[in-house]
């Protein structure tokens, strides 16, 4: 086995664990498609969280294994909570609570990322809807 295989296998184990904890079907690491989410370790050892729609790259986030696990978990939590909770303040609070069960660092990161998104898209007033994480946003 190569280092890349070891890294892919370790990532698959963690994706499976998170999926089970979230109550969703796991996804295969390394299976690349041109329509949907792709999680893979590239030949250079970099970890990718990429999304394709109809053959066109929507995004390709590159980071550590922890980054990939955070993106995977946060995306699932955000999607699932949005389906169940209409009130945005309650939605952001529930996202924080669920992510905290996996990692308090991920929960805080999600709040910081959401605040940055609000600023980027000209909605800084929406930061007030986010839970207090004990640090300035």
Task: Give each language-model segment a name.
Residues 1-39:
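N-terminal "first-domain core" detector
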Residues 3-4, 8, 81-137:
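Intrinsically disordered, low-complexity, charge-dense segments enriched in Lys/Arg
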Residues 14, 18, 71, 117:
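Residues that form generic nucleotide/phosphate-binding pockets
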Residues 18-25, 79, 106, 125:
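Short secondary-structure junctions and interdomain/linker hinges
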Residues 25-27, 32-34, 63-66, 80-93:
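Generic structural signal for short, solvent-exposed loop/turn connectors between secondary structure elements
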Residues 31-57:
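Short aromatic-glycine-(Arg/Gly/Cys) micro-motifs in beta-strand/loop hairpins
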Residues 47-51, 55-80:
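Aromatic- and glycine-enriched beta-alpha-beta binding-site module
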């Amino acid at each position: 086995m190569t280092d890349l295989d070891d890294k892919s296998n370790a990532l698959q184990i963690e994706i499976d664990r998170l999926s089970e904890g979230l109550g969703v079907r796991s996804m295969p690491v390394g299976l690349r498609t041109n329509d949907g989410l792709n999680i893979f370790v590239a030949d250079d050892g970099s970890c990718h969280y990429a999304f394709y729609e109809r053959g066109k790259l929507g995004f390709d986030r590159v980071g550590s294994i922890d980054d990939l696990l955070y993106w995977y978990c946060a995306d699932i939590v955000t999607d699932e909570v949005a389906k169940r909770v209409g009130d945005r303040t309650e939605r952001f609070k529930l996202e924080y609570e669920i992510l905290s069960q996996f990692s308090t660092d991920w929960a805080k990161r999600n709040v910081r990322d959401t605040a940055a998104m609000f600023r980027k898209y000209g909605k800084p007033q929406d930061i007030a809807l986010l839970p207090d994480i004990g640090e300035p946003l």
